[in-house]
């Protein structure tokens, strides 16, 4: 059964890399304040990622999204207070660049610094192997380019993003070239590894897969996004990643596989940390 195609707008390894192995996914728990709101939990997660993983003199990748926002905020605070010095950061979107500049965080690009000490970003889905779906905010290409070059990629999410299998909980974004975009959309929809999904061209703002306009969404790179909606988990994530990447017209996709070093997770019971060195993933 081939994937269906729709034009409707619907809600939609670098050298020296350290990642969490399947046999060594661990967890730890940090209790939150009583009755913390969702934003407060996101803040705690973002702050913890910087407190635990960023040291003076580092090159840091800055993610995009509502949780990554707090990591950028925390980095700015610690630079302003003098607790951190000599930091150079690489943003993964224009939104993040603007936030970082407003906080006085020194920035560069991969052209100046090709290897990062750590990158911090959110995710839309996380499976028990710490594979991710990312790109709901439309920054998947820059996110992957930056984060694949980090020695440590730290993921920050709330527990609603945890899943048994990638796909059903959040559409998988695929960034494509504008040239003959409908041909590319149909080609993606026909791939065996994504059979049964519905391919939807993102409309309105590229920063959300919820329709908010009548024009085709355009990324920071001038490309379009196809969101793949799944009813069942992706059977072979690695195969899907390979087939999508090898499709002519596809720039990149939102499957981040074998990249996560640690996942910091906010939930009603506190902040839990999954990664090498603790208990197996609990979800």
Where does each model-flagged region fall?
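Low-complexity, intrinsically disordered segments with a bias for serine/threonine
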Residues: 7-10, 25-27, 31
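Conserved phosphate- and dinucleotide-binding cores of soluble alpha/beta proteins
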Residues: 30-37, 43-44, 95-283
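Active-site catalytic microenvironments in core metabolic enzymes, especially phosphate/sugar-handling
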Residues: 36-54, 67-113
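N-terminal chloroplast transit peptides
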Residues: 1-19
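Short coil/turn segments at beta-strand junctions that form active-site/ligand-binding loops
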Residues: 56-58, 151
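Glycine-rich beta-strand-to-loop/alpha-helix junction loops that act as flexible
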Residues: 59-67
């Amino acid at each position: 059964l081939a994937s269906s195609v729709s034009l409707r707008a619907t809600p939609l390894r670098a050298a020296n890399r350290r990642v969490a192995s399947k046999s060594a996914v661990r967890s730890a728990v940090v209790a939150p304040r009583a009755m913390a709101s969702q934003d407060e939990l996101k803040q705690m997660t973002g702050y913890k990622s910087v407190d635990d993983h960023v040291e003076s003199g580092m090159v840091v990748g800055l993610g995009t999204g509502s949780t990554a926002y707090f990591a950028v905020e925390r980095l700015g605070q610690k630079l302003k207070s003098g607790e951190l010095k000599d930091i150079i950061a690489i943003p993964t979107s224009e939104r993040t660049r603007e936030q970082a500049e407003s906080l006085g965080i020194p920035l560069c690009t991969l052209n100046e610094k090709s290897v990062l000490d750590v990158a911090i970003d959110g995710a839309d889905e996380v499976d028990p192997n710490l594979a991710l779906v990312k790109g709901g905010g439309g920054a998947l290409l820059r996110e992957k380019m930056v984060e694949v070059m980090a020695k440590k990629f730290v993921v920050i999410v709330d527990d609603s993003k945890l899943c048994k299998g990638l796909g059903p909980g959040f559409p998988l974004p695929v960034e494509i070239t504008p040239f003959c975009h409908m041909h590319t959309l149909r080609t993606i929809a026909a791939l065996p590894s994504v059979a049964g999904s519905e391919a939807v061209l993102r409309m309105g703002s590229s920063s959300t897969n919820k329709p908010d306009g009548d024009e085709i969404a355009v990324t920071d790179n001038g490309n379009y996004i196809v969101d793949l909606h799944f009813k069942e988990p992706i059977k072979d994530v690695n195969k899907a990643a390979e087939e999508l990447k090898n499709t002519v017209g596809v720039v990149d996709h939102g499957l981040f596989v074998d990249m996560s070093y640690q996942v910091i997770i906010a939930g009603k019971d506190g902040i839990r940390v999954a990664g090498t060195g603790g208990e197996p993933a609990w979800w």
